[in-house]
Amino acid sequence: MHWIWLVLLLAVVGAIVGAATNALAIRMLFRPHRAYSIGKWQLPFTPGLLPRRQKELAVQLGNIVANHLLTAEGLGKKFGSTAFAAELTNWLKKQLASWLRSERTVESILKPLFQADIGREHLVVQSKSWLKDRLKRYLQKNKEVPIKSVVPQELQDRLTDWLPEASALLLKRATAYIDSEEGEQRIGAMVRQFLTTKGKVGSMVSMFFSADKLTEYVLPEIKKFLHDEQTKETVQSLLQTEWHRMLNRPLASFQAENYVDQFVDKAAEELEGKIPVLNWYNAPLSTWTTPYAEPLVERGVPVIVGMVTVYMEQHIADILSKLRLEEVIEEQVASFSMAHLEKLIMNITRRELHMITLLGGLIGGIVGLIQAVIVHFFY
């Protein structure tokens, strides 16, 4: 009977010692978090293993993740897999379809992103201000530049080719005016003014011809002059001369900067209600995206996903090298408090560490039994 109690006692003591030893060893992996000293003598095993080697642990974890887990080859295969592309496509389709059906306006979406007033009126004012400033800067910078350097060559050629037509149109309009009642009255008034302002010469002419009679003689001659081919050539030559002279004038000679504000304000007034983007700006997305929703979702998303996955597959190595994952992980792990790092490791390995403690107790119990047998038979 005494022998049985001895066996049980030694087995229990061995189990307790074995379990306690393993539990203490596990505890010493994490604790203490800092070094303790008596005077100048630092106590051994302080700090614990992981606190002492936290920096080295961070470096090794970074290398393991970057070189063996998140590798370019592995991620490239993932991006290149059909299953991943299909999953990403379906997810993006759902997200885009939901977004296009949204009752939110473009303004409400953009405002939080830019953290500024981007209402329609504000955008119009800012656009006008920006355009005025740009035009004035351009005119100031190029004030000595001839017009021909500013006007596109194609437009210059078209206007030059149009000059014969313009001269013909000018003469045609002049002829039509002369043939009109207003034109005849105007010519008659000019004749009367001539007679009254030329003193003796006018009085002498008036003795032979009345103003109306003289007008009847002058009108056919004017019409004949307007229909003459030489007149057409002269007008065309004058227009071409003035056109080329204008092309060589400096931009500043037109004083265009004085009309910039008026021009921009008028253009903005005319265009504001005709630009679809501005009309869509304060309208819910669903009211104007409906015609485009199906093509975007069904055809646009697969194309975009295909382009993105191919690009990522081809350039993932460069992207990872720029990210420097090992440095990111190293810095992150090194910045953890030891308590947080201990919690992370314990959450992952708690069951296994508990089994190690129990294994220590089991081995200690077996050693205790062996000791009991040795004591009983040899002592």
Swiss-Prot record:
Location of the protein in the cell: Cell membrane
Pfam families with a match to the protein in the record: DUF445 (PF04286)
A GO CC term assigned to this protein in UniProt: plasma membrane
Annotated membrane topology: Multi-pass membrane protein
Keywords: Cell membrane, Membrane, Transmembrane, Transmembrane helix
Record PANTHER family: UPF0754 MEMBRANE PROTEIN YHEB
Family per similarity comment: Belongs to the UPF0754 family.
Name the record gives this protein: UPF0754 membrane protein ABC1518
Annotated organism of origin: Shouchella clausii (strain KSM-K16)
